């Protein structure tokens, strides 16, 4: 390889690192990030555009879900907005989330979607204000009503979505092993874990089962470009 080519590749590698493409500990590189500061959400595809908007929240632009969606033929989350073109297998999806429903509603929730293939086939992490067999779970929708797939027994998973404050989240999936981990606030210890390979890949997204809230500072890491 010519010396000039070596220099070019070295500079390209440095450029990728400067752009945020450095692989993390799991070997996943930054594929996309979105902070909504330009005031739009062109990269997002909501199931009901009338229920989503970008608003100024104390000087920061955020992506807000303003109303619950309509129930479908299967029991599943009613509102989602998918990150267009972000079809991944193994990934790390992180950001900030806030539930805006009255905290007195203990079953309030916000959801993180992944491996979304169509409205009847996807996974979701259900961060909630209480824990039982259907709240604060990792759920699978596979052509039928959602089922709980996380390992934590019903009612024992750690729930933290009990206020109207912002919470940091992270969802990690290893498509080869089926391992899924969901974190809220504490990025070192997952609150929900599962192992399932029913759906191998798909889009990621944000939303809720039947509540309102907002999202910001979203980042997606995965394999490839």
Where do the protein language model's features map onto the residues?
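Secretory/extracellular carbohydrate-interaction modules
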Residues: 71-143
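Extracellular beta-strand elements of beta-rich domains used
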Residues: 36, 218-220
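Extracellular carbohydrate-recognition regions
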Residues: 24-49
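Flexible glycan-contacting loops in extracellular carbohydrate-active proteins
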Residues: 192-216
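Short tryptophan-centered beta-strand motifs in secreted/extracellular beta-sheet-rich domains
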Residues: 95, 164-175, 180-182
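Short, aromatic/His-centered strand-loop micro-motif at the edge of beta-sheets
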Residues: 144-168
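Beta-strand-rich interaction surfaces with strong enrichment in secreted/lumenal proteins
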Residues: 79-86, 155-161, 205
């Amino acid at each position: 390889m010519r010396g000039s080519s070596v220099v070019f590749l070295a500079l390209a590698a440095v450029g990728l690192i400067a752009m945020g493409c450095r692989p993390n500990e799991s070997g996943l590189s930054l594929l996309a990030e979105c902070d909504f500061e330009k005031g739009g959400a062109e990269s997002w595809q909501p199931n009901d555009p009338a229920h989503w908007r970008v608003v100024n929240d104390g000087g920061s632009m955020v992506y807000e879900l303003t109303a619950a969606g309509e129930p479908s033929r299967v029991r599943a989350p009613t509102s989602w907005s998918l990150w267009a073109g972000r079809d991944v297998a193994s990934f790390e999806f992180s950001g900030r989330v806030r539930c805006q429903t009255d905290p007195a509603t203990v079953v309030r929730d916000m959801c993180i979607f992944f491996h979304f293939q169509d409205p009847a086939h996807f996974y979701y992490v259900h961060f909630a204000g209480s824990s039982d067999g259907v709240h604060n779970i990792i759920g699978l929708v596979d052509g039928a009503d959602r089922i709980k797939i996380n390992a934590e027994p019903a009612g024992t998973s750690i729930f933290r979505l009990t206020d109207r404050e912002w919470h940091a989240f992270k969802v990690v999936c290893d498509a080869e092993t089926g391992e899924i981990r969901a974190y809220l606030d504490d990025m070192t210890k997952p609150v929900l874990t599962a192992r399932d390979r029913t759906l191998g890949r798909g889009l990621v997204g944000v939303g809720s089962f039947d509540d309102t809230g907002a999202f910001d500072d979203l980042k997606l890491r995965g394999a490839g470009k």
